[in-house]
Amino acid sequence: MNMCTDGKKYHSTATSAAVGASAPGVPDARAIAAICEQLRQHVADLGVLYIKLHNYHWHIYGIEFKQVHELLEEYYVSVTEAFDTIAERLLQLGAQAPASMAEYLALSGIAEETEKEITIVSALARVKRDFEYLSTRFSQTQVLAAESGDAVTDGIITDILRTLGKAIWMLGATLKA
């Protein structure tokens, strides 16, 4: 267990002699703390997005309702998987994941959706914008994890970025119509 500059304890594979040093492939305590801060925001972002996607899933209207209703379900299932994986990664690193709507809203860069009647085009454009935001944020975390030698977090984030990239591309193609 490593002690970070913020006084929190974080687990890593580093030996106590390597704490604060940059052992090859082993993130130091400061890097782990920085990664955990970003992962906490990702959990919050995904928590807010999960609820937002449900709002769209329930309240969209338009000619292609059934297809978009099912697409939004695919998205929130995917978000759930990422949400859980990142929260569990935080726990593996010895940190705590935010676990309340109040925490999510305080940490998230994604705004709540309170509108109840949403056109399909509007909902998909908003989802695309949120996915683009997530892609930018996850890319920053992926770089930090890779540079720090945190291969596990790097791999998790790379998988999420692959999924987001495809969704952004497909939403862009859909919205061109």
Curated annotation (Swiss-Prot):
Q: Which residues form a coiled coil?
A: none
Under the heading CDD domains, the entry gives: DPS
A Pfam family this chain is assigned to: Ferritin
- PROSITE patterns, per the entry: DPS_1 (PS00818), DPS_2 (PS00819)
Please list which residues make up the signal peptide.
Answer: none
UniProtKB keywords: Disulfide bond
Checking Gene3D superfamilies in the record gives: 1.20.1260.10
Summary of subunit composition and partner proteins: Homodecamer; either linked or stabilized by disulfide bonds.
Question: What family, per the record?
Answer: Belongs to the Dps family.
* Identification of the protein by name: Antigen TpF1
Q: Which organism is it from?
A: Treponema pallidum (strain Nichols)
